[in-house]
Amino acid sequence: VGYQPGRAGLSIAEFWRPQLSDYRTFVGLDVHARTIVGSALDATTGEVLRHRFGCDLSEVVAWTRSLPGPQIATYEAGPTGFGLYRRLLESGTACVVAAPSKLQRPSGDRVRTDARDAFHLMRLLHLDEITAVTVPSVEEETARDLVRSREDTRQDLMGVRHRLSRLLLRHGFVYDDGAAWTQKHDRCLREHRGGDLAFMTAFDANDETVVQAVARRDRLDKAITAMAEDSPFTPMVNRLGCLRGISTLTGFALAVEITDWHRFTGSTIGAYLALVPSEYSSGQSRQLGGITKTGNTHARRLLVEAAWHHRRDYRPSPSSVLQARWDKAPVAAQLRGQAGNERLHHQWVAFTARKKRPVVANVASPASWRAGAGPSR
């Protein structure tokens, strides 16, 4: 048995260094939508082979299997997904998907081609300098696609609502009678639909888009809620729901984005979510900057939004909504969630006493969330 995938953020040396000598051929693949370039090193003879393919993954798999074995291949994670990874594993070729942000590149290298990129990946693989990403299962990947479709719809809805508001603002309408985008707000908007034909046509176009986006969002919400209640992700969603600010939709999204929480510690989860401060230190100088923002942006946004709920006063007795979520979780998770809610609120109190800006305090709160309030079995 060679490389065993499944954990993220660690060099493949931590998985298969004892079996490194078992592999004879190291393959680097530069994968694009329509072309794939391969570079292979025979570690026994030192021979380097190169090949260019179209978009047919079967050709890549056949070429890789024709090389002296055993073989191990790598390519960068990206928009092409993990189909090639799965095909290679099925054919008997070990494969690791590299984290693009962790690839080492010479600062003086100003020539980038597909062939050079494939050779670079091959070389890093042979030198054991690849940082692997966690490859989700097919079920996890499809659930993640569902969640991200909902996120795309949310952004579309927010954008078209802004466009409709700006259209009305340019014609002198400002709504200041309560919360926006309620039934009352909708009735008020339609009362200001009048005007010339061009304005009414523009209004109707944006209004129809709003209605369609709301319907699409609600349809996705129902699908996510149903999946959260009866799927392999249900236990994790129920445990996450013990925290304030983690609804069913948020809990399901976090469950499918992070998948295996136990691969992280309290310190590494912050780095994965890019909630740790950037640093520029040298010698006696130490300078900290804003958060790195290099990790999973989807999970980070969810946690930052959920952290705002801990700013409110903490009550030992949960609300009816939170109690309903607690009833679905194990007792250990309930106790862990209660302790986490209290600790996160006390963090907010401490930040307020130090006169920290709310936006800064809110980002600092989820950075240590996993350490004291992560899901419990």
Residue locations for each model-derived region?
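A detector of single, family-specific signature residues
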Residues: 1-377
